[in-house]
Regions:
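Acidic/polar, solvent-exposed loop segments in beta-strand-rich repeat domains
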Residues: 99-101
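Short beta-strand segments
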Residues: 28, 85-89, 127, 151-157, ...
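Conserved A3 ("GATE") glycine/threonine-rich loop of ANL adenylate-forming enzymes
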Residues: 32, 132, 156-159, 186
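Structural signature of FAD isoalloxazine-binding scaffolds in flavoprotein oxidoreductases
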Residues: 175-178
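Generic beta-strand structural signal
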Residues: 122, 147-152, 156-160, 164, ...
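ATP-binding/phosphotransfer module of carbohydrate and carboxylate kinases, centering on a glycine-rich
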Residues: 1-83, 93-96, 113-124, 136-146, ...
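Active-site nucleophile and cofactor-binding loops and adjacent substrate-binding regions
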Residues: 103-105, 109, 125-131, 151-154, ...
Length: 333
């Protein structure tokens, strides 16, 4: 069994006055780790437990690790659960509860819901992890005041999820939407999916760093070299924006080009779905106004019909790495 780490947040109230509150487990299943949290119906995480995602084992073994996380949290908190939700990467059949395909775990046609339900004797639900994160923000985070939203996460890739009127838009196959793989530049940079010119290849944090490294080669006097101690491998998104704040021209050019591409992709999403809000997640968003202000300006210039016809707010997601736990728990509400 995988090694477990647990954390109880602010204790739990086991008195009779708390018996009316309902509790749910949310599991965030990733390629390297599994996180499980108990969330109450008011959106408070009362406990979290996690373990590594084991390599080279069958799917049923990983599902057993998930079940053990839930069981251990129940023992530690003394709480009764109403249900369990799971956010899993890949193509999910939400009706049957099967993981049709997950490249990160090398899973095909895994009956996740059936197997987990047998071990926990609780209602179990599963959905795509990016969708689940969007649902978490909708219920408990920056999306609470909106009826419709699209969440775009800028990380290693570009993740996305859509919520309309409290319901996930999952598409015909249950895989959610892959907005990161809309093409914004024909014949452009090769994407991990095999196509060229994908949004992800230009707007992910990975893309920002790649663009900055390339620009550094053309300017040996750039402040970026000093900030990375002469080693480009130390570069990250924060350093790029730090250099921008210090007036570095190379960083300025990189961020301008990056926000141009990001704005193009975000505008495409707005023109296609007309949500009330675009939620942006990922570490890049910590750059604040130096990143968001030019992005919003560029998007507003491009929206079909203008902002008066289709006003959309662009805001930063607020739940961070816990969005998956919140959203997974919300599947069981």
């Amino acid at each position: 069994m995988a090694q477990l780490q647990s954390e109880i947040k602010n204790g739990t109230d086991k008195s009779s006055s708390a018996t009316a509150v309902k509790y749910y487990a949310g599991i965030d299943l990733g390629g390297t780790g599994i996180k499980c949290g108990i969330v109450d119906e008011n959106g408070k995480i009362v406990a979290i437990k996690k373990c590594p995602t084991r390599k080279g084992v069958e799917a049923k073994e990983i599902i057993s690790d998930m079940a053990n996380l839930v069981k251990d949290l129940q023992k530690e908190t003394g709480l009764t659960l109403e249900g369990v939700g799971v956010g899993c990467p890949g193509l999910i059949d939400t009706e049957k509860g099967n993981v049709v395909f997950c490249c990160n775990l090398a899973w095909r046609n895994v009956p996740l819901v059936k197997t987990l339900k047998e071990q926990l004797n609780l209602p179990v639900f599963v959905a795509n992890d990016a969708n689940v994160a969007a649902l978490g923000e909708y219920h408990f985070g920056a999306g609470k005041k909106y009826k419709s939203l699209v969440m775009i996460t800028l990380g290693t890739g570009v993740g996305s999820g859509i919520v309309f009127n409290g319901k996930l838009f999952e598409g015909n196959l249950g895989a959610g939407v892959e907005l990161g793989h809309e093409v914004i530049k024909i014949g452009g940079e090769k994407c991990t999916c095999g196509r060229k010119g994908c949004f992800e290849a230009y707007a992910s944090a990975t893309a920002l760093i790649r663009q900055a490294k390339k620009a550094m080669d053309g300017d040996k006097e750039s402040l970026l070299w000093k900030l990375v101690d002469g080693d480009k491998e130390n570069l990250n998104g924060k350093i790029v924006f730090d250099a921008l704040r210090e007036g570095d021209k190379t960083a300025e050019k990189v961020v301008k080009k990056y926000t141009d591409y990001l704005a193009a992709g975000v505008t495409n999403v707005i023109n296609a779905f007309h949500p009330q809000a675009i939620l942006l997640g990922g570490g890049i968003c910590a750059a604040g106004d130096v990143f968001l202000t030019p992005l919003k300006r560029k998007v507003n210039r491009q929206i079909y019909g203008g902002t008066k016809f289709a006003p959309v707010e662009i805001v930063v997601a607020s739940l961070g790495n816990d969005a998956g736990i919140y959203g997974a728990a919300a599947l069981a509400f």
